[in-house]
């Protein structure tokens, strides 16, 4: 059993999603949004740190998956996003949880089959894959999508790695 925490970073709203992977079965554990209500940016970062740490303490994930940065037109927004993202990564590292990063296009392609999918399509697939009765909030759905992507990609990577190891051993005999 592997518990995966997915994070969709943001300086005002950070989404989180926690899922459990047992074999090929993915189960929903929790999701939500960390809303930073203050205009004081250092206090927003502090709120992200505290709340992500609480989620980690409660669910004890073995894996931390987060969205990679994308090139933004507004440099100030990109800097704030990178700082919020960095704070979340530091929380994971302080808890000795390995960090994996996924591009937004990769997440969309993994869940929907096309890298240019819209938020509604991603939300629908998250709801379908995790058998949810309602759509999660947008940022929480994105975080769950990142966690699901990690499960799918790591499963395929492990399968490929194992196959290569067997072939390599076969050649050595």
Curated annotation (Swiss-Prot):
The name this protein goes by in its record: Crossover junction endodeoxyribonuclease RuvC
Protein localization = Cytoplasm
Which GO MF term does the entry hold, naming one?
DNA binding
Q: Write down the NCBIfam families for this protein, in alphabetical order.
A: PRK00039.2-1, ruvC
List the catalysed reactions: Endonucleolytic cleavage at a junction such as a reciprocal single-stranded crossover between two homologous DNA duplexes (Holliday junction)
**What does the similarity note say?**
Belongs to the RuvC family.
Where does this protein hold Mg(2+) 1?
8, 139
Q: What EC number(s) does this enzyme carry?
A: 3.1.21.10
Instruction: Report if keyword DNA-binding is assigned.
Output: yes
UniProt subunit comment: Homodimer which binds Holliday junction (HJ) DNA. The HJ becomes 2-fold symmetrical on binding to RuvC with unstacked arms; it has a different conformation from HJ DNA in complex with RuvA. In the full resolvosome a probable DNA-RuvA(4)-RuvB(12)-RuvC(2) complex forms which resolves the HJ.
What's the stated role of this polypeptide? Answer: The RuvA-RuvB-RuvC complex processes Holliday junction (HJ) DNA during genetic recombination and DNA repair. Endonuclease that resolves HJ intermediates. Cleaves cruciform DNA by making single-stranded nicks across the HJ at symmetrical positions within the homologous arms, yielding a 5'-phosphate and a 3'-hydroxyl group; requires a central core of homology in the junction. The consensus cleavage sequence is 5'-(A/T)TT(C/G)-3'. Cleavage occurs on the 3'-side of the TT dinucleotide at the point of strand exchange.
Q: What is its main location?
A: cytoplasm
The enzyme's first-digit EC class, named in words, is: hydrolase
Q: Could you give the cofactor binding note from the entry?
A: Binds 2 Mg(2+) ion per subunit.
Which organism does this record belong to? Baumannia cicadellinicola subsp. Homalodisca coagulata
- What cofactors does this protein use? Mg(2+)
Q: Which GO terms describe its biological process?
A: DNA recombination; DNA repair
Q: Which SUPFAM superfamilies match?
A: Ribonuclease H-like
């Amino acid at each position: 059993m592997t518990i995966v925490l997915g994070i969709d970073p943001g300086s005002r709203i950070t989404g989180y999603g926690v899922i459990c992977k047992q074999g090929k079965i993915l189960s929903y554990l929790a999701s939500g949004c960390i809303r930073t209500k203050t205009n004081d940016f250092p206090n927003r970062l502090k709120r992200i740190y505290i709340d992500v740490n609480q989620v980690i303490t409660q669910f004890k994930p073995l894996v931390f998956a987060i969205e990679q940065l994308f090139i933004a037109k507004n440099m100030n927004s990109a800097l704030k996003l990178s700082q919020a993202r960095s704070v979340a990564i530091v929380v994971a590292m302080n808890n000795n949880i390995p960090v994996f990063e996924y591009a937004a296009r990769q997440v969309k392609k993994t869940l929907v089959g096309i890298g240019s999918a819209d938020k509604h399509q991603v939300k629908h697939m998250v709801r379908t894959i995790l058998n949810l009765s309602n759509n999660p909030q947008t940022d929480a759905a994105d975080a769950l999508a990142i966690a699901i992507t990690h499960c799918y990609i790591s499963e395929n990577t492990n399968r490929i790695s194992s196959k290569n190891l067997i072939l390599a051993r076969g050649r050595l005999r």
